[in-house]
């Protein structure tokens, strides 16, 4: 496996990230303005995603569609929402009338032929900040750590990872732990570790 701390190795990628958030008014007593700014900083998330791509693309045996391995331009959506909204989406799309922490909607079509330098749509990741906040308290780590955990989980789903068995879930969760250790080069990286 590649040394994840070797910052000299990088894949030249462009990520078009659409970042949307919900009104944090409901959680203003729980989350300070500095954390809200960090959560909603598009560059922070884009840098994390690029570092995760670096990690995946340098390891040819990992699950990743060939169209992704051949492309360098990607588009995806990241939506932060609340429990009520994610419950409605979960009910509509997965027929489960309950809130959840993360949903992902992969959009990759392996058979599409893209012109050079065309953006490949990966899909969308939706995360409930309310659930992430609760889970961060349960696991005794920061909200930002939990959000990165959930976004990395959704990201792997966009790339075709799944966990129908406990063995595949354990493999996916172990790889998520590696992804979270990759340096992301963000100027806010030190701030991310403070939370």
UniProtKB/Swiss-Prot annotation:
Q: Which cofactor does it need?
A: Zn(2+)
Does the UniProt entry include the keyword Hydrolase?
yes
What SUPFAM superfamilies has UniProt attached to this entry?
Metalloproteases ('zincins'), catalytic domain
Q: Which Gene3D superfamilies match?
A: Metalloproteases ('zincins'), catalytic domain (3.40.390.30)
Q: Which InterPro entries match?
A: MetalPrtase_cat_dom_sf_prd (IPR023091), YbeY (IPR002036), YbeY_CS (IPR020549)
Give the Gene Ontology MF terms in alphabetical order: metalloendopeptidase activity; RNA endonuclease activity; zinc ion binding
Recorded coiled-coil stretches? none
Protein localization: Cytoplasm
Cellular component per GO?
cytoplasm
Any Gene Ontology biological process: rRNA processing
Q: Which domain of life is it from?
A: Bacteria
The record's comment on cofactor binding reads: Binds 1 zinc ion.
UniProt keyword list: Cytoplasm, Endonuclease, Hydrolase, Metal-binding, Nuclease, Ribosome biogenesis, rRNA processing, Zinc
The EC number on file is 3.1.-.-
Q: What class of enzyme is it?
A: hydrolase
- Write out the residues that bind Zn(2+): 153, 157, 163
Regarding protein family, the annotation reads:
Belongs to the endoribonuclease YbeY family.
- Function description: Single strand-specific metallo-endoribonuclease involved in late-stage 70S ribosome quality control and in maturation of the 3' terminus of the 16S rRNA.
* Protein name in the entry: Endoribonuclease YbeY
Gene encoding this chain? ybeY
């Amino acid at each position: 496996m590649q040394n994840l701390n070797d910052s000299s190795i990088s894949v030249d990628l462009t990520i078009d990230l659409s970042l949307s958030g919900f009104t944090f008014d409901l959680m203003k007593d729980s989350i300070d303005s500095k954390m809200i700014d960090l959560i909603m900083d598009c560059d922070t998330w884009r840098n994390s995603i690029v570092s995760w791509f670096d990690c995946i693309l340098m390891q040819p045996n990992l699950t990743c569609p060939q169209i992704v391995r051949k492309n360098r331009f990607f588009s995806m959506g990241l939506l932060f929402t609340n429990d009520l909204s994610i419950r409605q989406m979960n009910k509509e799309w997965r027929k489960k009338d309950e809130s959840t922490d993360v949903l992902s909607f992969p959009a990759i079509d392996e058979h599409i032929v893209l012109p050079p330098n065309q953006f490949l749509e990966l899909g969308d990741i939706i995360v409930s900040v309310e659930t992430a906040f609760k889970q961060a308290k349960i696991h005794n780590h920061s909200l930002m750590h939990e959000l990165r955990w959930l976004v990395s989980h959704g990201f792997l789903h966009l790339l075709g990872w799944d966990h129908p068995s406990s063995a595949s879930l354990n493999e996916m969760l172990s790889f998520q732990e590696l992804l979270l250790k990759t340096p992301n080069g963000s100027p806010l990286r030190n701030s991310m570790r403070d939370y």
